[in-house]
Amino acid sequence: MKPRHKRALMIVAALAVIGIAALLILNALNSNIALYVTPSDVVAGKAPQGQAFRIGGLVKEGSLKRDGLTVHFVITDLVKDIPVSYTGILPDLFKEGKGAVIQGNLNPQGEFIASEVLAKHDENYMPPEAKHALEQAQKNGSAK
């Protein structure tokens, strides 16, 4: 084989390896993306269908009910409420009236089945997107 053909073959092989690696990386990133929505968005039908997503808001006062490892509560943006079911150990800072971001899927009955629950870590912190979404939901709810 001529050196020119070897070089061309090496370039083609390198491009193929880079292309396959890029495809695998993009596929992995796409499967780990979880869109963020508010309870008002979910009620309005703006939640992604058939994929996991995140809901952020406040845990509604008086809604927390424990049944062994399964916990039922309501997440609210102070305009709309979504019932949530989670099986697992909740974070220590998870409390009623405090902010939370939950990841999971919506079942056909309208209950959010959480696979992960995150609680805000101090009384002053709220993720910027959660704060903005709560403000927007309150503004839209009071405008109606």
Curated annotation (Swiss-Prot):
Membrane-topology descriptor: Single-pass type II membrane protein
Protein name: Cytochrome c-type biogenesis protein CcmE
Molecular functions per Gene Ontology: heme binding; metal ion binding
Localization, UniProt: Cell membrane
Keyword line: Cell membrane, Cytochrome c-type biogenesis, Heme, Iron, Membrane, Metal-binding, Signal-anchor, Transmembrane, Transmembrane helix
Any one cellular-component term (Gene Ontology): plasma membrane
Residues in the Extracellular compartment per record: 29-144
Chain positions recorded as heme binding sites: H121, Y125
Annotated Pfam families: CcmE
Cytoplasmic side: 1-7
Transmembrane segments: 8-28
